[in-house]
């Protein structure tokens, strides 16, 4: 009987596909721009990954999604995870329900989203960059008891459509981020963010408005965005 490890070592096509899968897992926006000669095997691979996830967790995955096998996605009855069409979840991202992502939402590498009890909702087309943290719960911090013994509270988080959450940014429980807003890299959002606002800093504050920066945009690209931040 042929040893699978030996066959893998001797077959350059298998080695190429394994490396290509790793590349897609860490940069999933590339999946949506695959050339036809790669799309068939990549879609078959994703069908296997997603079927295994559905069999073990309370998740709903819309058509055309990409889920890295290295991602950690956990849903329970009443605390499920729902991904709309053409969403992507990169390697080492952590998702825990209740969580609902609209169509074409991207969650990049090492981002963490936990819905607590009240849940997280993310609107269509929003980008959540690498290392971002969105936690819909917090601990009591009364001085007369250890933090570990105090109650956990959850009010929920709502993030609108076409929002960009920058790398290593944090969104705290109870916050609403309006449509088209931008949260800068490393910002910590503790209050609601208006639509179109650009916020930065710790704690985050409004530093601009997307509509006032026409020079930093451009015509929409064709298909799925190819940037990864």
Describe each PLM feature range:
Residues 68-83, 88-176, 202-203, 210-217:
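Flexible, glycine/small-residue-enriched loop-and-beta-strand segment within the central core
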Residues 44, 166, 184:
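Short, conserved clusters of charged catalytic residues that mark active-site
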Residues 172, 182-184, 188:
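A generic "structured core" feature
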Residues 1-64, 125, 131-132, 138-144, ...:
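Terminal amphipathic alpha-helical/low-complexity segments used for targeting or macromolecular assembly
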């Amino acid at each position: 009987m042929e040893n699978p490890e030996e066959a893998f070592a001797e077959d350059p096509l298998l080695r190429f596909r394994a490396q290509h899968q790793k590349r897609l897992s860490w940069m999933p926006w590339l999946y949506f721009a695959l050339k036809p000669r790669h799309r068939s095997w990549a879609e078959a691979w994703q069908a296997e990954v997603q079927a295994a996830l559905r069999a073990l967790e309370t998740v709903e995955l819309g058509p055309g999604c990409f889920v890295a096998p290295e991602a950690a996605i956990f849903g329970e009855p009443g605390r499920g995870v729902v991904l709309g069409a053409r969403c992507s979840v990169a390697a080492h991202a952590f998702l825990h329900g209740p969580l609902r992502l609209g169509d074409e939402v991207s969650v990049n590498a090492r981002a963490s989203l936990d819905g607590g009890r009240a849940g997280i909702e993310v609107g269509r087309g929003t980008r959540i960059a690498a290392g971002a943290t969105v936690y819909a719960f917090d601990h009591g911090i009364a001085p007369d008891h250890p933090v570990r013994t105090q109650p956990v509270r959850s009010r929920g988080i709502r993030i609108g459509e076409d929002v960009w959450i920058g790398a290593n940014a944090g969104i705290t429980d109870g916050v609403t981020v309006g449509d088209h807003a931008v949260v800068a890299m490393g910002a910590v959002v503790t209050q609601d963010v208006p639509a179109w606002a650009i916020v930065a800093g710790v704690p985050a504050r409004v530093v601009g408005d997307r509509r006032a920066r026409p020079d930093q945009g451009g015509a929409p690209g064709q298909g799925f965005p190819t940037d990864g931040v």
